[in-house]
C-alpha cells in the first residue's frame, strides 16, 4: 500500500518544501532546469532534465528549488543578450542533494538580428553540446556557460547546484538559484 499522486512545483523565487505522506516509501522526481533567456535571434538554451526514483520515509521533509528563466535585458536595441536560466534542485537535510538539473545558457546577440554564438544547454552527468564557438555545455548539474562574442561573454550561463552560471550575466548558484540578468 501507499499513496500515489503527483505534486508539481513552479518557480516562486523561494525554497519550497514537500513532506513525504504517510505510507509512502519511494518517490519519483522529475526536475528541469530553467531555460536561458531569449533574444531577438531566438530562444535561450534549454535546462537539463533529471528523473530518478528515491527511497524516502514518511514525514521526511524535502526542499525544492525551481529555477527562474533567464532574463532578457530590455534596452530597445538589437544588441540585447540574455541571462542564464536558474537550476532546479531537490535536497534533504544537510543539505543532501537528490536531484540537480542545471539551467540553460542565455542567448548572445551582439550587433546582429541573428545569434552569433548559440547558448549551451544544461546537462546532468555528461558534457552538453558545444556552441558554435566551442563553448561547452554544463556538467554534473552545472548550468550551460555564457554565450561569447569575440571571446567576450555577452550572455549569462545557466546556474548549477554548486556553481554560478558562466560569464558576467550568469545565474547564481547554491542558496540563490536565480536566472541571470540580461546585457545591453
Label every PLM stretch briefly.
Residues 26-42:
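Calcium-regulated, polybasic anionic-phospholipid
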Residues 15, 36-38, 73-76:
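Short amphipathic, basic-aromatic surface patches that mediate peripheral association
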Residues 176-184:
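Extracellular low-complexity, Gly/Ser/Thr-rich intrinsically disordered linkers
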Residues 11-22, 129:
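Surface-exposed ligand/attachment interfaces on beta-rich extracellular proteins
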Residues 21-28, 57-61:
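Extended extracellular/luminal ectodomain segments enriched in beta-structured repeat modules
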Residues 45-168, 180:
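Secretome/extracellular-domain signature
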Residues 169, 174-176:
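A motif-centric signal for short, conserved binding hotspots located
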Residues 1-13:
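Boundary/junction segments of secreted and surface-exposed precursor proteins
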Amino acid at each position: 500500500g501507499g499513496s500515489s499522486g503527483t505534486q508539481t512545483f513552479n518557480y516562486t523565487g523561494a525554497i519550497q518544501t514537500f513532506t513525504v505522506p504517510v505510507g509512502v516509501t519511494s518517490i519519483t522526481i522529475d526536475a528541469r532546469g530553467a531555460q536561458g533567456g531569449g533574444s531577438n535571434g531566438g530562444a535561450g538554451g534549454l535546462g537539463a532534465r533529471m528523473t530518478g526514483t528515491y527511497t524516502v520515509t514518511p514525514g521526511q521533509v524535502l526542499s525544492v528549488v525551481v529555477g527562474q528563466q533567464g532574463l532578457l535585458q530590455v534596452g530597445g536595441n538589437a544588441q540585447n543578450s540574455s541571462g542564464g536560466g536558474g537550476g532546479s534542485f531537490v535536497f534533504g537535510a544537510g543539505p543532501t542533494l537528490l536531484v540537480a538539473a542545471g539551467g540553460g545558457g542565455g542567448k548572445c546577440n551582439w550587433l546582429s538580428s541573428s545569434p552569433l554564438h548559440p547558448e549551451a544547454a544544461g546537462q546532468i552527468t555528461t558534457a552538453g553540446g558545444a556552441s558554435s564557438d566551442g563553448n561547452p555545455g554544463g556538467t554534473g548539474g552545472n548550468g550551460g556557460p555564457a554565450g561569447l562574442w569575440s571571446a567576450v561573454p555577452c550572455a549569462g550561463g545557466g546556474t548549477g547546484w554548486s556553481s554560478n552560471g558562466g560569464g558576467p550575466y550568469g545565474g547564481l548558484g547554491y542558496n540563490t538559484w536565480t536566472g541571470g540578468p540580461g546585457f545591453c
